[in-house]
Design a protein with these regions (language model features):
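Residue-level preference for non-acidic, small/hydrophobic
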Residues: 52, 71, 102-105, 109, ...
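Hydrophobic (often cysteine-bearing) scaffold residues that line and stabilize catalytic clefts
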Residues: 44, 48, 97, 101, ...
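Extracytoplasmic
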Residues: 60-62, 92, 136, 185, ...
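N-terminal carbohydrate-binding/catalytic regions of secreted carbohydrate-active enzymes
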Residues: 65-83, 87-88, 96, 103
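Short, surface-exposed loop or secondary-structure junction motifs
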Residues: 135-332
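Catalytic loop of the DD-peptidase/beta-lactamase superfamily, centered on the K-T-G motif
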Residues: 2-3, 26-77, 257-383
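Short active-site loop at a secondary-structure junction
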Residues: 85-144, 184-193, 270
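Secretory targeting and sorting signals
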Residues: 1-31
């Protein structure tokens, strides 16, 4: 369900954008075949205000935005905390970060690789032989990072909303995926899915003898002082300040209604998408990651390298976690995330002149297309 939304986002962006620390040029990025790019201009405050004005509306109930980088900074918010009290949206509110979680997972795995605890060339079967049948070829750990493992999606609840308070163990999700057998040989094709990162989270736990959540906390959140960021486990609530999330849902007669989906058990998302964070924390993370402060140079290069795939298949657009795109004539690394009621993005230009973090309380966060408010934010920030 998530892949079409992310694919639509990529298409939309390709065709189209106080006092934060600056981000240096990325330590490594794939060759783009273009001349040296001009740095981003100062953030266009007027365009950014226009992008988020008029909330709540049919597309979103709130938006929180942070623009940074060497070219300057801008911060803004719009909308309401909830549709009952209609008080102003909390600009420091926490939200469900969805698949942005994957970049934290990748950072943890790559730190372990730098320490020699995890070998990216070693098959996953070496570490967790009990999971895989003989029908699976050796799956390099690297292929979990860059979405080329060949694993099929795992199964979830048929009626997700009806089961929003129920717990689905990630191991059950993985078992359902592996029962389907491989889709293709590892490394042959790239398919954006959660399953690789769910397995990667379990692998992190296997090699460390620790929980994935604790590893992320001690390696990423605590060193960067990301005090708003945590993993909720089976708790359906968002702790601390947050704005409510709403989702359009279809009635039996075909009409739609807005439903408050703030409370939702994310246990099945695990290392692929269960994180809760804030725009301030994700901006800190974005600066540190792409500024080379979280990973050694070799491991950051690994994250920012597009894999070579089999002849005749579409070229890769994801590295070891983030997606590589050209937006507004500039090379950008980014990652989106979406859970019902919440959509977000982190992005950085390769030259470090612009970073963007947003959270949009989108009423179509799991839809097939890009939310109009999010699209306007990207257009204003990265053009």
């Amino acid at each position: 369900m998530k892949l079409p939304a992310r694919a639509a986002l990529a298409t939309a962006l390709v065709l189209g954008l106080t006092g934060a620390a600056a981000v240096p040029a990325l330590a490594h990025a794939p060759a783009t075949g273009t001349a040296v790019e001009a740095p981003s201009p100062r953030p266009d405050a007027r365009a950014l205000r226009e992008a988020i004005k008029g909330l709540p509306n049919a597309d979103a109930t709130a938006a929180l935005v942070r623009v940074g980088g060497t070219a300057g900074t801008w911060r803004g918010s719009s909308g309401v905390h909830d549709l009952v009290t209609r008080r102003e949206a909390d600009p420091h509110g926490r939200f469900r970060a969805g698949s942005t979680t994957k970049i934290v997972t990748a950072a943890v795995a790559l730190q372990l690789a730098a320490e020699g605890t995890l070998d990216l060339d070693e098959p996953v079967q070496h570490y967790m032989p009990e999971l895989f049948g003989k029908e699976f070829r050796p799956i390099p750990v690297r292929s979990l990072l860059n979405y080329t493992s060949g694993l099929k999606p795992g199964d979830g609840f048929d009626d997700e909303y009806a089961h929003r308070y129920d717990t689905l163990d990630p191991r059950t999700v993985v078992a359902s995926a592996l029962a389907k057998g491989p889709e293709h040989a590892p490394g042959a094709e790239q398919h954006y899915r959660n399953i690789g990162y769910t397995v990667l989270g379990l692998l992190i736990e296997r090699v460390t003898g620790d929980t994935y959540a604790h590893q992320a906390r001690q390696r990423v959140f605590e060193p960067l002082r990301m005090r708003d960021t945590y993993f909720p486990g089976a708790d359906p609530r968002i702790r601390g300040p947050h704005n409510h999330g709403y989702q359009k849902m279809q009635r039996p007669d075909g009409t739609t209604r807005l439903v408050d989906v703030t409370e939702w058990n994310q246990s099945d998302r695990f290392a692929a998408g269960d994180m809760i964070s804030s725009t301030a924390d994700l901006e800190t993370f974005t600066r540190a990651l792409f500024g080379g402060k979280l990973l050694p140079r070799a491991q950051l290069k690994e994250m920012l390298t597009l894999p070579r795939l089999a002849p005749g298949v579409p070229e890769a657009v994801f590295g070891g976690g983030p997606q590589h795109m050209r937006i507004g004539g500039k090379a950008v690394w980014l990652k989106t995330g979406a859970r019902y009621g919440y959509a977000n993005l982190i992005a950085a230009t390769e030259d470090g002149s612009r970073t963007l973090v947003y959270s949009v309380n989108a009423t179509d966060a799991k839809g097939r297309g890009m939310n109009p408010v999010a699209e306007r934010i990207v257009g204003a920030a990265l053009r």
